[in-house]
A protein has these predicted regions:
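A conserved acidic beta->alpha catalytic loop
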Residues: 38-49
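Acceptor/aglycone-binding surface of glycosyltransferases and processive sugar-polymer synthases
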Residues: 62-77, 82, 94-175, 202-223, ...
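A conserved hydrophobic helix/loop-capping motif in glycosyltransferases and polysaccharide synthases
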Residues: 3-12, 19, 26, 40, ...
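Cell-envelope/extracellular polymer assembly enzymes that use nucleotide-activated donors
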Residues: 2-4, 36, 180
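Short, acidic, metal-binding catalytic loop of nucleotide-sugar glycosyltransferases
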Residues: 21-33
Length: 386
């Protein structure tokens, strides 16, 4: 087994040598010295690259800034059968990754995760919000949405096989790379295990952290929502449409009595918007499933949207709505433009118009995400061999 250790780096001159040294200790202990340390440099200007090379690492430049881009550069440049990733700030002791390497190398799992929450966290090593809010909530969402039994989705120390890396097709360049790895591991059917690791305090008190709590937390959450549209959009949308669609139709026809309680046109002011919100949530589900494929994030290909049918249905619904409105205006004109009670008919017309407009606009937008483009830099066909 050949072992590679991938370390992302951006201006970590004061700690990179220590991190590389710990990584080399891991290679010696877990792989008998058969391995390498590869640093993905994100454009450091403080001499980090030179210090990493001096410590015995090979440096792979990452052209684009970002945690994910730096790791991808290091992993793609590595040659090991098993890859360990960890940070350059020496807050992780790479020597603790030996059980992770053993689990992957033995075939008992494809991706071995570290867990700071199950291990030891030095005082001051992890911000309060990260430890008690951000990481637990995001980890719960991953357990709930994707069925992975993990406690620390943001732990930076992980080990995985080369085959697992290729099957995950990782593309995210920011901090959400950590969540992408877990989501795609689940979608690819990879076996994931978790091991306790320690988190040490960063002694450089004057260092500006690369991690931004709220911005990066939102990036993680946004990515998880994108890959769980069935829970976030489809389920609530279907419930709203199933409940308030019939309610809206019934109240547009007349008052309804349920269990001795009268429901009249006043309740249309709740039913109509909730029904329309339900429709839009279902369209958001269609957007999300198609955008994943459009952006190269993977996932199961959705059924193709019959654009022409949705356009026709939308236009027909809109025309019927306009016809109902026209009837109201005709009656109002016939009554001498005086007071006219037409709340039910106007509500029905409004629902039809909104449904038609939502169908047409969303169908057009969704169909755009189904287009396939050929890069101008890539040949459409390969030239014939001589």
């Amino acid at each position: 087994m050949k072992l590679s250790v991938a370390i992302p780096c951006l201006n970590e001159a004061r700690t990179i040598e220590k991190a590389v040294g710990l990584a080399r200790d891991l290679v010696a202990a877990a792989a008998g010295g058969d391995g390498e340390v590869v640093v993905g440099d994100n454009g450091s200007t403080d001499g980090s690259r030179e210090r990493a090379e001096k410590a015995g690492a090979r440096v792979a430049p990452a052209d684009r800034r970002g945690y994910g881009f730096a790791l991808l550069a290091a992993i793609q440049a590595s040659k090991g059968d098993v890859v360990v990733m960890g940070d350059a700030d020496a807050t992780y002791d790479f020597r603790e990754a030996a059980p992770l390497v053993e689990a992957v190398a033995s075939g008992s799992c494809d991706l071995a995760m570290g867990s700071r929450l199950r291990g030891r966290i030095e005082k001051g090593a992890m911000p309060f919000l990260h430890r008690w809010l951000g990481t637990p909530v995001l980890s719960w969402l991953i357990r709930r949405f994707f069925g992975l039994r993990i406690t620390d989705c943001n732990c930076g120390m992980r080990a995985f096989s080369r085959d697992a890396f290729e099957r995950m097709h990782l593309v995210c360049g920011g901090m959400e790379f950590a969540s992408e790895m877990l989501v795609k591991a689940s979608l690819a059917g990879l076996r994931v295990a978790e091991f306790p690791v320690s988190l040490h305090r960063d002694l450089r008190t004057d260092r500006v952290p690369h991690l931004h709590t709220w911005r990066d937390g939102w990036r993680h959450l946004r990515f998880l929502l994108l890959f769980a549209p069935h829970v976030v959009f489809r389920l609530p949308g279907a419930v709203l449409c199933a409940v308030f669609g019939p309610v809206t139709l019934a109240l547009c026809l007349g008052p309804v009595v349920v269990a001795g309680r009268l429901f009249d046109y006043h309740h249309l002011f709740y039913a109509v918007p909730l029904f329309c919100i339900g429709q839009q949530l279902l369209w958001f589900n269609a957007f999300a499933t198609r955008f994943r494929r459009f952006a190269g994030l993977g996932g199961e290909p959705p059924a193709r949207l019959p654009l022409e049918r949705w356009l026709l249905a939308g236009f027909l619904a809109g025309l019927v709505g306009l016809a109902v409105f026209a009837g109201v205006l005709r009656d109002w004109w016939a009554s001498g433009m005086g007071a006219l009670f037409a709340v039910r008919r106007c509500s029905l017309a409004l629902v039809l118009l909104l449904t038609g407009a939502l169908s047409v606009m969303n169908a057009l937008m969704t169909s755009m995400l189904e287009l396939h483009f050929v890069s101008l830099h890539d040949p459409v066909s390969k030239p014939d061999s001589p």
